[in-house]
């Protein structure tokens, strides 16, 4: 998605990355930043600056009927770990999700939303150098988490709310992706917004989301012209580099 490496890269929309719940709180919304706060989460493990390779602490319990899938090595022991999501809501209506490491540890959090559709989660490495994130979707917006020291860390926007990407529900964005949007040689997390045109293929706005610990802020925004048919679809989906929510994530339902 450097120029528009949308295939698997431009999966999100520009607006949602900016802030989760920004719209409802009246916060600023950069080109394509979403502000819906329909979904929220509660973390079951605290964040710390560093942790030894191979997480073994059991900070959460993986439900017996959870949907699972192999994912990245999140604890640095060189072995792939497993992302999971409950297929049934908890007593409060939330949907727990988490990661169980090859070393036997488990950590998780819960996504809460009024959306009637299934929840889904994708784990990704933004830069390919260990900048791990989790993208939790309720098909209306995508909540952004950092993954650090064997815990999910909700990334907060300037208003102190969890950062979220819009998926066309509020009109701020349409997807999430990871591409080198500023041409500096490093992949960026971006919010995407596809704008169809009556007499053309349309354009895609890309807003870089800058991560600094538990803080997420909107960075530069640019607009590119769609050059191939699949780019419009990619700009209306969730992906990061070579992984997509549809193919590599876990879902709480069909």
Model-derived segments and their meaning:
Residues 2-14, 18, 23-32, 149-254:
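Acidic, small-residue rich beta-repeat scaffolds with periodic aromatic anchors
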Residues 87-91, 139-141, 194-199:
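Short glycine/acidic-enriched loop and turn motifs that connect beta-strands
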Residues 66-74, 116-132, 172-182:
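Beta-propeller blade termini
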